[in-house]
């Protein structure tokens, strides 16, 4: 017998979905149209969500996923890439994906992708 999970939103973001169910935090890259390729906004939002996961004692495990069934994540979005770097909405060169990778590795909870 399969039961329907009632996920609740932890926080609203522009490019990710961040929700919770029974000790599980789920972070979904929500850019299906671009095969969930990340932008500076995506990595900033993921970093914030991972910080919340680290700090909340009711979160026991983190699941990272991508929207749709085509791709988990295609990497960096080439549409926002400038000359040699990724450009955010403010025109500043940044992507910070290594910071997010460090957070994933150092969070004291299991992370499943």
What is each model feature region?
Residues 10, 66-103:
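Glycine- (often His-adjacent) and acidic-residue-rich active-site loop
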Residues 13, 56, 75, 107-108:
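Acidic-histidine catalytic/liganding microenvironments
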Residues 38-39, 76, 85, 108:
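Short, flexible helix/strand-to-coil boundary loops that buttress conserved ligand/catalytic motifs
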Residues 100-113:
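Conserved catalytic cysteine-centered active-site region
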Residues 1-65:
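Conserved CoA-thioester-binding segment of acyl-CoA-metabolizing enzymes
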């Amino acid at each position: 017998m399969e039961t329907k999970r009632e996920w609740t939103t932890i926080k609203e973001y522009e490019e990710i979905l961040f929700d919770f169910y029974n000790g599980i935090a789920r972070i979904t890259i929500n850019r299906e149209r671009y095969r969930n390729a990340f932008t500076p906004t995506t990595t900033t939002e993921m970093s914030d969500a991972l910080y919340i996961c680290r700090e909340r004692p009711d979160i026991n495990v983190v699941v990272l996923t991508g929207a749709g069934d085509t791709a988990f994540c295609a990497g960096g979005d080439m549409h926002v890439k400038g000359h040699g770097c990724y450009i955010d909405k403010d025109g500043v060169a940044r992507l910070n994906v290594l910071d997010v990778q460090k957070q994933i590795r150092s969070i004291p909870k299991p992370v499943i992708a």
